[in-house]
């Protein structure tokens, strides 16, 4: 199991073992329990989005766990059947993952970052897109509207959903939390809103 801090792009000695290397995310998904997963990645906004999703799901009586880069380490979570697991996934974790297949894969945004680890932007983008690679036709890929064009070049099996920011903004006045009303939260909340529609949550 490879530590997320180690980059194969910079370690030639490990590259020959690339096919055998797995990550904590892979091990988590090899568990046979029937849980549903929501994986959130992006350069910015991951933690905020995960916390909001956790709050909304629990408020609506869903069994819910949260881990990864937020909350508890993934492998310490006690998964139960029919529970939701919210995972904050970094590009480091995703880069070498092979078996991850989220029911709901969320890509918030991508900006220039972590290039010291990934070496170039292409590697960074490819690591983020790992969350979509193993999805099936019954799973959902929820993607920032600015990255729709990338899917013309990449095969996507999951159902593509693009949050409607304008639709969310119309609902914004109903928010009671003044912090969440700040414009910087609009993007994150539009993704939360999109997922609540898929889960048929109305509160």
Locations of the language-model features?
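Adenine nucleotide phosphate-binding catalytic loops in nucleotide-utilizing enzymes
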Residues: 118-125, 129, 155-203
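Phosphate-binding loop of NTP-binding sites
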Residues: 4-141, 145, 149-156
